[in-house]
Amino acid sequence: GSCSFCAIHSHQGRIIQTRSHESIIREAKKITELPNFKGYIHDVGGPTANFRHPSCAKQLKVGVCRDRQCLFPKPCPNLDTDHSDYIALLQKVRALSGIKKVFVRSGIRYDYLLADKNDRFLDELCRYHVSGQLKVAPEHVAEHALANMGKPGKSVYLKFMRAFNKKN
């Protein structure tokens, strides 16, 4: 994302570091074995839940682009917006013995979600991984402030809000 006000890329780097499904599944299994575990995994996500992988194949070869951000002012044509890996991970965790519910409580990038060619992730998210409310970060509604922040305009948030409300 690299929003201009956010420190995440400063201390974690601009290339997203991915944990393997196996690592997350192992950790979830350990959690289910805890004596006080009640069946709820409260978050499967990272700093931005739905950004699990480097943004594009180019990042793995030559690093991040110096002259642009992946999502601002509009999504890069090379941006990999497919959420199917994250969907598969959530399904695997959800299928573990002893799990009642798996939540996604890390903030999601709604502009990244909307850039996906299909709405399968939004379906999955609303059906299985939220309690009716979802954590997103519409930091402002004034267009000039959003532009200075490196965030999409208010219309993108409203489009997401309509899509979420329709599914939820």
Question: Model-derived features: where do they sit?
Answer:
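Canonical Radical SAM [4Fe-4S] cluster-binding loop centered on the CxxxCxxC motif
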Residues: G1-R19
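Short cysteine/histidine-rich metal-coordination sites, predominantly Zn2+-binding motifs
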Residues: T18-E27
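Conserved, mostly hydrophobic/aromatic
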Residues: C3, I24, V136
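Conserved SAM/AdoMet-binding glycine-rich loop
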Residues: K30-N168
